[in-house]
């Protein structure tokens, strides 16, 4: 058609029980929006286009909040001339309050797991839609309420099932091998990153962005801090509704959230590292010569554990962090000790365990590559799911 909807963004407002709608359209016309919950109509609005855009506010007669574990979704029909779009949205807000990460104004401890989006047959391509659903279900069965979608822009279908499940995810971008010492490296990276932000903006499950991971110095050349700062600024300019971590683990330049990676395998040493921080002192950072922890903002250990357990007998070709435990009992004791140290810290708002399932040579998943459980997941869930010190 000559008149059509090119793209649209949704802005939930819980206090007003409204949905802000910003659309880019082609041709002249009137955009009409109708919302439904459980098949019942609960709001409508229309507005004429001006200069190729339409901005309007949709009032809702029924407010159902999208929350962790409860992916309450509204259906939305958008009509512009002959063009009709069937869409959906979730009513949820995120904001930072000191050291806390608030979802709908409630402090929520994020029990995250690293998910790299690998599959034995298709590698980066899931064999079926059911396989995408299963990964969310397996994670939640282990007591996690979300994931770092690690070094991969996941498919929209996966994100849809995260939306349905109320499963919290962090959007990332693959950056392995990027020359962080040269701003010219952004020539291809930045446009692709901005495309990911635009494509996935409306997913309520995405509660934050992280464009880079472990930005080490590149072949002896120092990281260019302006490279990270510029991508952070572009991310925040495009999306004012979500926090952004400039680079996960290191080396931080400007960030809304401070995170570190720590694969210490001794629970006592691991806990001792953060004891001062637990008591209100400084955060110990093993990259202290390159980055300084920011006090008073949300902080978490976004990679830890990575405990090797060779369930399939792969042997010497398999890999995990540190010395693997000799028994499953030893594994569970180590897992509990490491995780307890983070749950009990009133200045930590989240953790992210490495990782959900084995990936190729990496044998540090809680499930095998084929998604078979290595351990009693009820035990893992009990460790993960207990109340954290920072939680409401």
What are the functions of these language-model segments?
Residues 1-156, 161, 166, 192, ...:
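Secreted/periplasmic carbohydrate-active enzymes, especially glycoside hydrolases
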Residues 134-137, 146-371, 379:
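Substrate-binding/catalytic cleft of secreted carbohydrate-active enzymes
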